[in-house]
Swiss-Prot record:
Effect after changing H313A: Loss of thioesterase activity
Keywords: Chloroplast, Fatty acid biosynthesis, Fatty acid metabolism, Hydrolase, Lipid biosynthesis, Lipid metabolism, Plastid, Transit peptide
Region annotated Disordered, chain positions: 1-78
Name recorded for this polypeptide: Acyl-[acyl-carrier-protein] hydrolase FATB2, chloroplastic
The organism's taxonomic lineage, starting at the top: Eukaryota, Viridiplantae, Streptophyta, Embryophyta, Tracheophyta
Matching InterPro entries: Acyl-ACP-thioesterase_N, Acyl-ACP_TE_C, Acyl-ACP_thioesterase_NHD, FATA/B, HotDog_dom_sf
Species per Swiss-Prot/TrEMBL record: Cuphea viscosissima
Similarity annotation: Belongs to the acyl-ACP thioesterase family.
Keyword Lipid metabolism: yes
Encoding gene, per UniProt annotation: FATB2
Length: 412
C-alpha cells in the first residue's frame, strides 16, 4: 500500500469532502484498512486523512495537491513530427475514393468487346482500307437471317452485298442523298441500276458467325462500273462468298439508260481499283424460257410495300426469293445454291404482277443441279433472267469457289 501511495499523491487536508456526491470524493487518499465489526462485516473510514508512510516515516506533499482541468488549463503537448501528421483515416478514405474512381474510368476505356466485328468497327458502319479504295464491314449472322438448315439464306448474303455497297459510297463522301448518288448525279436525276450480278458461295455462315465483307469498284466498259465483293469468316479467314456486278446509269424521271457524264466520271474514277474481277464473267447466253419449255411455273407474285427501295422499284434481293419460288421443293430440301447469275432486263414496280418460271438446264455438269430461270410480268415482259447451280448440302469446301484469292492486293 505504501508503494501505491507514491504513484497516487493525496491533496492537502484542507479540502473538504462532500460524501454522497459523485465527482467530489475525499480530498485525501489512503489505503482502506478493514476493521472487524460485531456482525462480521467490514467498517471503512470515510475521511481517512493520515499521511502516507514509507518505511515507517511520514511523507508530506506540497499544499497545492493535484489540480484538475477546472483549476487551470493544461499546457499543449509539445510539437512533434507524429502529432503534426494529418488524420490518417481521412487521408486513407480520400485515397481509396480516388483509386476507385480511376479504376472505374480505366475499365470503361479499356473494356474489350466480345464481338469481333466491334474491335475495329465500334458502330457497325464499316471503314475504308488500302488508301481508301476498299471498304470493309463486319456482320454478325442473326437468328432471323438463317433458314431451315440453320445457315444464312442467300437473301441475307445479297442484303450484305447491298448494304456494304451503299455504305462504301457514303463513307467515300460521294453520297449526296444518302442512298448512292453523287452530287453530280443528283443534279442530273441519275441513279445507279444493276445490270448483271454473279454470286458464288463456297460455304454459308451459321447463326452467331461473324463475317467480313470487303468491296471495291472498278471501270466496266465505257459507261459502266463494276463492283466486287469478298465475304470471309472473321475467325478463320476462309473465303465464303465471291460476288461481282455491273452497274449502269439511268435517268430517274425518264427511266431510260444514260451515259456517264464527265462531271460524274471525275467524281467516281479516283475510287476505281485496277484489278481483275473476283469471278470470271459467265458470258453464256441464257436461252429463251416460256410456258412450253418451263418445268415449273409460279404465278400471281406481287410486290409488297416493304419490297420497294427508295427509287420505288423492287429491291434486287427480292428477285432471288421470287426465282426460288418455282425451284422444285426436293432440290431446296436436299441441295444448296452455290452459284447464281442474274441479268436484269427492266425494273418492277409496285403494281406489277409477276410469274416465276424454272427449267432444268440440260447443259449442266457435275453432281449437282442446274436451272434456268425467268421472272416476267403477266404480259410477258422480262424482268430478270438467271441461271443457278446447286450442290448437295454440307458439301462445304467442295463447292465451286476457287481457293485462290482475286482481290486488289493486300487490303488488310
Amino acid at each position: 500500500t505504501a508503494a501505491s501511495s507514491a504513484f497516487f499523491p493525496v491533496p492537502s487536508a484542507d479540502t473538504s469532502s462532500r460524501p454522497g456526491k459523485l465527482g467530489n470524493g475525499p480530498s485525501s487518499f489512503s489505503p482502506l484498512k478493514p476493521k472487524s465489526i460485531p456482525n462480521g462485516g467490514l467498517q471503512v473510514k470515510a475521511s481517512a486523512s493520515a499521511p502516507p508512510k514509507i518505511n515507517g516515516s511520514s511523507v508530506g506533499l506540497k499544499s497545492g495537491g493535484l489540480k484538475t482541468h477546472d483549476d487551470a488549463p493544461s499546457a499543449p503537448p509539445p510539437r512533434t513530427f507524429i502529432n503534426q501528421l494529418p488524420d490518417w483515416s481521412m487521408l486513407l478514405a480520400a485515397i481509396t475514393t480516388a483509386f476507385l474512381a480511376a479504376e472505374k474510368q480505366w475499365m470503361m476505356l479499356d473494356r474489350k468487346p466480345k464481338r469481333l466485328d466491334m474491335l475495329e468497327d465500334p458502330f457497325g458502319l464499316g471503314r475504308v482500307v488500302q488508301d481508301g479504295l476498299v471498304f470493309r464491314q463486319n456482320f454478325s449472322i442473326r437468328s432471323y437471317e438463317i433458314g431451315a438448315d440453320r445457315t444464312a439464306s442467300i437473301e441475307t448474303v445479297m442484303n450484305h452485298l447491298q448494304e456494304t455497297a451503299l455504305n462504301h459510297v457514303k463513307t467515300a463522301g460521294l453520297s449526296n442523298d444518302g442512298f448512292g448518288r453523287t452530287p453530280e448525279m443528283y443534279k442530273r436525276d441519275l441513279i445507279w441500276v444493276v445490270a448483271k450480278m454473279q454470286v458464288m458461295v463456297n460455304r454459308y455462315p451459321t447463326w452467331g458467325d461473324t463475317v467480313e465483307v470487303n468491296t471495291w469498284v472498278a471501270k466496266s466498259g465505257k459507261n459502266g462500273m463494276r463492283r466486287d465483293w469478298l465475304i470471309s469468316d472473321c475467325n478463320t479467314g476462309e473465303i465464303l462468298t465471291r460476288a461481282s456486278s455491273v452497274w449502269v446509269m439511268m435517268n430517274q424521271k425518264t427511266r431510260k439508260l444514260s451515259k456517264i457524264p464527265d462531271e460524274v466520271r471525275r467524281e467516281i474514277e479516283p475510287h476505281f481499283v485496277d484489278s481483275a474481277p473476283v469471278i470470271e464473267d459467265d458470258d453464256r447466253k441464257l436461252p429463251k424460257l416460256d410456258e412450253k419449255s418451263a418445268d415449273s411455273i409460279r404465278k400471281g407474285l406481287t410486290p409488297r410495300w416493304n419490297d420497294l427501295d427508295v427509287n420505288q422499284h423492287v429491291n434486287n434481293a427480292k428477285y432471288i426469293g421470287w426465282i426460288l419460288e418455282s425451284t422444285p421443293p426436293e432440290v431446296l430440301e436436299t441441295q444448296e445454291l452455290c452459284s447464281l447469275t442474274l441479268e436484269y432486263r427492266r425494273e418492277c414496280g409496285r403494281e406489277s404482277v409477276l410469274e416465276s418460271l424454272t427449267a432444268v438446264d440440260p447443259s449442266g455438269e457435275g453432281y449437282g443441279s442446274q436451272f434456268q430461270h425467268l421472272l416476267r410480268l403477266e404480259d410477258g415482259g422480262e424482268i430478270v433472267k438467271g441461271r443457278t447451280e446447286w450442290r448437295p448440302k454440307n458439301a462445304g469446301i467442295n463447292g465451286v469457289v476457287p481457293s485462290e484469292e482475286s482481290s486488289p492486293g493486300d487490303y488488310s
